[in-house]
Amino acid sequence: MLDYKEKFIGEGLTYDDVLLVPAYSENLPHEVNLKSKFTRNIVINTPIISAAMDTVTEHDLAISIAQQGGIGVIHKNMSIQRQANEVRKVKRSESGMILDPITLNEEALVGDALRLMAENKIGGIPVISKERKLKGIVTNRDLRFEKKLNKKIADVMTTENLVTANEDVDLVKAENILQNHKIEKLPVIDENDFLVGLITFKDIIKVKQHPNSCKDEFGRLRVAAAVGVSKDTFERIEALVKSSVDAIVIDTAHGHSKGVIDLLKEVKKEYPNLDVVVGNIATGEAALDLVRAGADAIKVGIGPGSICTTRIIAGVGFPQLSAIMNVKKALEGSSVPIIADGGIRFTGDIPKAIAAGASSVMMGSMFAGTQESPGETIIYEGRKFKTYRGMGSIEAMQKGSKDRYFQEDENDIKKLVPEGISARVPFKGSLKEVMHQLIGGLRAGMGYCGAKDIENLMDAKFIKITSSGMVESHPHDVTITRESPNYNLR
């Protein structure tokens, strides 16, 4: 018979149970380096990730967070084609050089050009032959007074004195060409006049505006996308890869299961160069099994999220700080990074998660209230809110997240067993403003701990505190008269 003491594997701590111990520092907060790893092969400039939730991350938020140095994970509660398009919108949003620009052939009509410009929010389209040789370019100026929608694009496009650049052009040279010729689009061609890319003045401006952007080797913003353990997983992955997704996230409530491990092995066999994040787990044993199966990053978190009810409904979970530390200990010496998913309530929880062993943190509720999130904006008692729901809520499961909770084959809504709720969160303004506070809190924590970079922060020490210590940590014995942008107790 199992000894009673063996039933308990240890003490479970979460962020509110500890504080970081201050240490000698030679670094001011603005001097610290925030670069970290999202996966084994992908570096991010800010260790912050937006969650793959249908009220959090679609292309608008993914673009914004990548511009701030982090990365977004596009949720999967949508059709395969739409998710692939969401990824494509992020990859096309800005680029050193657009490698696969939207084009028109010579036989296209004015109506085709106007439709493509409206759909993709662009002001110019290169016109090519069937062999992809550049023939001209059509811009909104060419079409401004054109009323005949069935007129051939070849009759209105610019062909004379067409300004182009060679393949070896860099952004500095490209900017000079654009300025000297007072144009906004610069087609890039090879020695045989084949179109190989497009450089736009807008992209050059964006590079200057967002110097800390998280980008791939081609200068495009990075983005990840979620997939589940379902019948269409490989079809979804194929579409995402064609859209140039940087990584996929096998997103399940229980990553330490045979179906997930088998899927991971199959994905890595089929796509050996595609980085795959797997989760969610909470133990060292689970982490080792997933790494052996080929995981490029491990997502840790069973039930810490504000809208998750797994710990209450299923009685299963693991306090988040201890879960991160257990997984970190098991992966000691491994190059596979840990993503701490859920439970972040204050900016100070971010340095705590990293000190426990996470390379980055994933958040949902922090971003659900931003203007870039896809949640519905509502007015309640005179204040603006946005909807926010767990992927285990009834509403999200109906939309497509049933497989995350291993209930894919259940079609009767009355028989679904939800592990999440639907809620609302206060409207917070732009994601840039929220990220400023999150990054500021992380920098402050690193400065107090004497950590010059993320790796150094992992050496920081903790002290456990009592409930009285937590009371002392918060503002006390006063009435708050003005709200702070980075502190509230709601």
Question: In which residue ranges do the predicted regions lie?
Answer:
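Catalytic beta/alpha-barrel core
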Residues: 73-77, 103-104, 124-126, 164-166, ...
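Alpha/beta catalytic cores of nucleotide-metabolism and tRNA/nucleoside-modifying enzymes
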Residues: 1-24, 105, 166, 226, ...
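Short beta-strand/loop segments at the ligand-binding rim of alpha/beta enzyme cores
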Residues: 43-50, 96-101, 160, 216-226, ...
